[in-house]
Amino acid sequence: MTCQTYNLFVLSVIMIYYGHTASSLNLVQLQDDIDKLKADFNSSHSDVADGGPIIVEKLKNWTERNEKRIILSQIVSMYLEMLENTDKSKPHIKHISEELYTLKNNLPDGVKKVKDIMDLAKLQMNDLRIQRKAANELFSILQKLVDPPSSKRKRSHPQRRCNC
C-alpha cells in the first residue's frame, strides 16, 4: 500500500494539470480532499520517498499534448482502480473519484492504444511469415510518415482564386 501512497502526489498533478481545461474543477477543494486521502494512506511514511517518483517520471517522456492525454488516461484509470479498494463512504474519496471519472470521460481511451503498442512489441520480427507481412506493409507505413494528413494539407495550401 505504501507504493500507492506516493502516487497521490501524481493525482494532485493530474488534477492541477486539467484544472485549466476543466473549469468545473474546484482545485482548492480537491487539494483538501487529496490531503485527506494522503492521511488515509499515511503517505508521510518514510518509505514513500524511497526510489523516487513512480508515475511522475513517466510523464517526462510524453511531450506532445496528444501523447500526454494518452498516458494521463492510463494514469487516471490507475487512480480509479486504486480508489475502488478504499472506503467509498468517505466524502473526500467520493469527490475525488467523481472528478477522476469526469476527467476520464474527457480523455481518449488509452487502453486500446497501449494494447496496440504492446502487440507491436510482441511481434516476432525474426519469424519469416511476420517478415513477409511487414515487408508487404513497409511502403504504406513510410507513406504515412512522409505524407502529412489530408486535413493539414488542405489547410496549409492557400486557396486559389478563379481568374475568370
From Swiss-Prot:
PANTHER family: INTERFERON GAMMA. Coiled coil: none annotated. SUPFAM superfamilies: 4-helical cytokines. Pfam families: IFN-gamma. It is found in: Secreted. One of its GO terms (biological process) is adaptive immune response. Keywords: Antiviral defense, Cytokine, Glycoprotein, Growth regulation, Secreted, Signal. The gene is IFNG. Glycans are attached at N42, N61. GO terms for molecular function: cytokine activity; type II interferon receptor binding. Homodimer. Residues 1-19 form the signal peptide. InterPro entries: 4_helix_cytokine-like_core, Interferon_gamma. This is Interferon gamma. Produced by lymphocytes activated by specific antigens or mitogens. IFN-gamma, in addition to having antiviral activity, has important immunoregulatory functions. It is a potent activator of macrophages, it has antiproliferative effects on transformed cells and it can potentiate the antiviral and antitumor effects of the type I interferons. The keyword Glycoprotein applies. Belongs to the type II (or gamma) interferon family. It comes from Meleagris gallopavo. GO terms for cellular component: extracellular space.
